[in-house]
Regions:
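Beta-strand/loop nucleic-acid-binding surfaces
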Residues: 108-117
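Cys/His-rich short segments
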Residues: 37-71
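Short aromatic-glycine-enriched beta-strand elements
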Residues: 86-88, 92-99
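Short nucleic-acid-contacting surface segments enriched for D/E, G, S/T with interspersed K/R
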Residues: 117-126
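Conserved small/polar residues in nucleotide/adenosyl-binding loops
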Residues: 127-133
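Short, conserved beta-turn/loop elements at beta-strand boundaries and strand-helix junctions
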Residues: 80-85
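A broadly conserved sequence feature marking short terminus-proximal activation segments
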Residues: 1-41
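Conserved hydrophobic positions within beta-strands
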Residues: 74-76
Length: 136
């Protein structure tokens, strides 16, 4: 191609991108909406209640759509105490990651517990959850 022909070429700016915002979907979205309203919502199938809300029953693989509200209390099944949080942690003071089975739920949820000492938490202890303030 000659230099003259190159300068006669039509040019247009082009940017390859795919604009997409994450969607939580109808099940987890409703669970997060419940948290923003200070409610713990689980999904139910028969006698089983899953928290956090599950889209499918992990045993029967059935689609779940029935929601139930649960209390803000549960049993600590296990925990890990973080005495010296690192930069990647969301909290900059000692805290615990605790696996808590909410009263009335079949499954457990991972929750961060603050404003306590390691000696205040025992596995298989009863606790009251403090729900975070969530803005959707």
């Amino acid at each position: 191609m000659s230099e003259k022909n190159k300068s006669d070429m039509l040019r247009a700016p082009f940017k390859l991108e795919y604009d997409y915002e994450r969607s939580t979907g109808p099940i987890i979205g409703k669970f997060f909406e419940g948290l923003s309203n200070q409610q713990i919502l689980g999904t139910k199938n028969g006698d089983n209640v899953y928290v956090p809300a599950a889209e499918f029953d992990p045993i029967t693989y059935e689609h779940l759509s029935e929601f139930v509200e649960l209390p803000e209390t549960g049993t600590v099944k296990s925990f890990t105490w973080i005495d010296q949080p690192r930069k990647h942690h969301l909290i900059n003071k000692p805290f615990a990651f605790a696996l808590i089975q909410i009263d009335g739920a079949t499954s457990s949820i991972l929750h961060m517990i603050t404003n306590c000492n390691e000696s205040d938490i025992e596995a298989v202890s009863y606790t009251h959850l403090t729900l975070p303030t969530i803005r959707l």
